[in-house]
């Protein structure tokens, strides 16, 4: 069980980081530049994609937590995992609801200025990327210390 937990600690944060970078920093901005993608279409796609991304992220965070219970990686790694999870929860529970309301209004035909909450979400995504990189290093260090 401990060996599976350690492999989980190596694989899941790298997968999580790849998903966030690919979706938040590649797919999201590029889709609005695609020919024929209107703001309404882009918002509709974005809502679905980010709902799915955040759902998978929550599962990954829980799976990583479970692996850390099975094979504790040390206080620093646990702290970084907690911080990444807090950032995710803030995004889902605090920032996304007003963004959803705003996109509903835009889809209903209102012409609204850019939202600061969108910038907050992007800032949290950048923080999450930095924390995931730190988590990867901490977990790799913890797993390496268990090797013969």
Tell me the role of every PLM-derived stretch:
Residues 45-47, 57-82, 139-142:
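Charged, compositionally biased, marginally structured helical/coil segments
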Residues 2-64, 106-111, 146-148:
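Interfacial loop at the N-terminal end of multi-pass membrane proteins
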Residues 70-105:
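Mid-chain, well-packed structural core segment of small domains
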Residues 8-22, 56-66, 79, 83-90, ...:
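Lipid-exposed faces of alpha-helical membrane segments in multi-pass integral membrane proteins
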């Amino acid at each position: 069980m401990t060996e599976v937990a350690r492999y989980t600690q190596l694989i899941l944060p790298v997968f999580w980081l790849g998903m966030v970078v690919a979706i938040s920093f590649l797919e999201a901005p590029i889709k609005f530049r695609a020919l024929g993608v209107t703001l309404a279409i882009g918002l509709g796609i974005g809502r679905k994609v980010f709902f799915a991304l955040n759902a998978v992220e929550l599962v990954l965070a829980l799976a990583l937590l479970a692996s850390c219970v099975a094979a504790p990686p040390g206080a620093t790694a646990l702290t970084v995992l907690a911080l990444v999870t807090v950032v995710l929860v803030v995004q889902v529970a605090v920032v996304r609801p007003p963004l959803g309301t705003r996109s509903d209004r835009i889809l209903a035909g209102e012409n609204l200025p850019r939202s600061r909450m969108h910038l907050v979400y992007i800032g949290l995504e950048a923080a999450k990327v930095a924390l995931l990189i730190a988590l990867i290093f901490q977990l790799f260090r913890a797993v390496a210390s268990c090797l013969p």
